[in-house]
Design a protein with these regions (language model features):
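Acidic, surface-exposed loops and disordered segments
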Residues: 1-307
Length: 307
């Protein structure tokens, strides 16, 4: 069904029916992002359980190269909500900012007179990024298990300098993701997903046929057809032209007019996560990393001073 209103970019909701071997599997399969928080506060004891679950997540070498900034003050939460364009951030009783943190480990190395190059190493950056997100997801799961909900805030990426100033982040500490925690006014329904048969590959990468691939995405976004209007056509045309030239822009518009609607993938990369803007700030982000004390993208030169 076509709608003049732009659909949620989070996809279709669904009620999941089925039997589970235990409550943990049920919780994981039916997990959904929460954006309507109630006024109920999180009891300190419950919050401690949740945070403890986070810090016990696996990390490379058990180094725990991340820190979590806990935000409870209403004034700061509202400032975050305005900054990240998400009103519900101000409604959530707790916001957690997850940061890669090599500052703490570098201080430890200096105090114990140990060599340290982690902020200049892509290997360390890559593992610490994974570690930070694994810790965040542990906290999400712990929160769900205790009757709370959560939602990740991707737009925090756009305001890294402001976050650094707000939370007094030292060099070697880089914000990765913001997470809101709280109780639901109304429990959210989970979103439809691609199936195990699409995401999991046996022994090696296996290309689906075009038909199977299209069927898989049609199953994930059933009936999602965005209505055509001149503004949307104009916007998509510009994105296509910027990304792949005039010929591709004409081809995309012809497909839209032939179908009689804008498809989900045309909506995602033509109107929402617009493909001509998403790569534009790559250099800016690298410069930001350098300001935060990270140099893993530069050639490393070993010490050449006096031995």
């Amino acid at each position: 069904m076509k709608s003049n209103k732009l659909p949620s970019h989070h996809g279709r909701q669904q009620k999941i029916k089925g039997k589970y071997p235990n409550q943990t599997i049920k919780l994981l399969v039916e997990r959904a992002s929460l954006r309507n928080f109630s006024d109920k506060k999180i009891p300190p004891r419950i919050l401690q359980y949740i945070l403890k679950a986070g810090i016990h997540a696996p990390t490379g070498g058990n180094l725990q190269p991340y820190s979590i900034i806990k935000v409870e003050k209403t004034k700061i939460k509202r400032k975050l909500a305005k900054l990240c364009w998400q009103k519900f951030i101000g409604d959530a009783p707790i916001n957690l900012l997850f940061c890669i943190d090599w500052h703490r480990l570098e201080r430890w190395a200096k105090l114990e007179v140990a060599p340290f190059t982690a902020t200049s190493s892509f290997r360390h950056f890559w593992i610490s990024f994974q570690d930070t997100l694994i810790g965040a997801q542990n906290i999400c799961t712990a929160a769900d298990s205790l009757g709370l909900g959560s939602v990740y805030i991707g737009t925090s990426l756009e305001f890294i300098p402001q976050l650094r100033k707000m939370f007094k982040l030292p060099r070697g500490v880089f914000p990765v993701v913001l997470l809101c925690l709280g109780y639901a006014k109304k429990p959210p329904l989970p979103r439809k997903k691609l199936g195990v048969d699409v995401i999991v590959h046996n022994e090696k990468y296996q290309e689906l046929s075009d038909t199977k691939l299209l069927n898989a995405f049609n199953g994930k976004y059933p009936g999602l057809k965005v209505a055509i209007n001149q503004d949307r056509l104009k916007r998509i045309e510009k994105v296509c032209r910027d990304v792949a030239g005039e010929k591709f822009a004409r081809k995309c518009l012809a497909r839209i007019k032939k179908n009689g609607y804008i498809s989900p993938v045309q909506y995602y990369f033509g109107l929402h996560y617009v493909a001509n803007l998403m790569p534009t700030d790559n250099e800016k982000f690298l410069k930001l990393m350098e300001k935060f004390g990270f140099n893993w993208f530069k050639k490393y030169s070993p010490y050449k001073g006096k031995k």
